[in-house]
Amino acid sequence: MGLFPMAENRWPWRLHATYNETIELALNAIERVAKDHSVHNLHWFIDHAETITARNIDRIACLGGGIAIQHRMAYQGEYFIERYGAKAAEFTPPINRMLAAGVPVGAGTDATRVASYNPWVSLSWLVTGKTVGGTAMYPAENRLDRERALRLWTEANAWFSSESGRKGAIVPDQWADLAVLSADYFTVPDEEISGLSSVLTILGGKIVHGSDEYQDDDPPLPPAMPDWSPVRSRSDFLVRPGERRQTAHACVAHGPTRHSHDGAGFWGHLGCSCWAF
């Protein structure tokens, strides 16, 4: 479906674009749509935007859009520097410039294709400006303090689902979503942020995870979905003892038939299954 009917019907959209050249083309189209249909208050947004320019940030602000950023550069920073140089990597993405322009900004992971789903790795990247390999990419003006980084992960993200005021903060009348952490995020050394974890997770007022001193509160795993999944009725879909170790190295040989196959023999003989995880 094109942007014109989406704007006409007041349906939000998101566009995935890493390079500014792509964002430029997308904004040209959105501006044409905006001449006939308002795109404000739709909560549309651009994902990624690592190389977006100040001009296009301002265009997004004028059109009422947002930007969702992810910590892909924490994993790909060295490769970006090798190709484009350290100077070009300093503002990938230009987070504080986005915030200064008044654009709604939310943080996530883009897992599991290009980054870990671990939020603490993302928060470490936002605060330190370093890759997981320790390469310093960002100057101080493109790094966030810990509170601001955490708010991008919580309160700010509610804008993108049109749920501002309903979730994202531990306050009355919002969803009771919270986590008790293994250590204090605000006081641990920078290099320990990525190692944090939740020992108690509450979602909608219900405990959904417990470990360490909260192990006794840890609920059983929910049954596999959908309810017709063969995992719920057939034991041969379960990993047998020892097979996990056997398949752990499977993706080192990507050619068809070169894996150590699992018991069912399905993913292995079709070639590399890295894409599935």
Question: Which residue ranges define each predicted feature?
Answer:
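Helix N-cap and loop-to-helix transition residues
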Residues: 19, 53, 94-96, 118, ...
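Predominant activation on well-ordered alpha-helical scaffold segments within soluble catalytic domains
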Residues: 24-27, 31, 96-99, 120, ...
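Active-site microenvironment of metallo-dependent hydrolases
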Residues: 104, 111-277
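Active-site core of metal-dependent hydrolases
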Residues: 1-92, 100, 106, 182, ...
